[in-house]
Amino acid sequence: MVHKNILRFMLNIFSSSQLVLTYFILAIAIVFNNTFALFLFFTQIFKTFILFYPKKIFKDSSLGNRPKGAYDCNLFNCGGKPNTGAIISGHMTSITMLFTSLLLSMNVADIFNKKILMLGSFIIITTGISRFLTKCHTLFQIVLGCFTGIILGFTSFKIQSLITNNRFNKDKNKVLNIFKLI
């Protein structure tokens, strides 16, 4: 029984990576008064609204149902039995969107870092595995979340390139330089 509880605890930690990253971005935005980090934070919030209708529409379909035995599947992994649709994994969408946007921005700023690519891949893979093992999502829902995250991350990156505000661009370089240190 202890082994099972430890396993569940570890799976919940890996499953919560998107929440930790969102809090990290919010902390950067507040502590450093950083407009780019605030932009990234709001894209994470906006993602929730984008996924609301697909989850609602497909909730009772075979594609949208959570696997049997799903438990603690909400944003904070503390929600008991889930009653929301599972199609398009929000956790996977969030972290894939964030890393896609950051990696594209770093590439354009000529500070691409393979370690960030490896770290992002590790976080995405471990989150996907934990969402699958906790029975919160099927493999299809996880992969669909990743594809949705890539599309939203690319869209976020394109929106960033349209913003010509000097402060935003300086703040963007500050955030990207944090990841350069890794």
Residue ranges and their predicted role:
Residues 2, 45, 113-116, 120, ...:
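Multi-pass membrane proteins that catalyze or facilitate reactions on polyprenyl-/lipid-phosphate substrates
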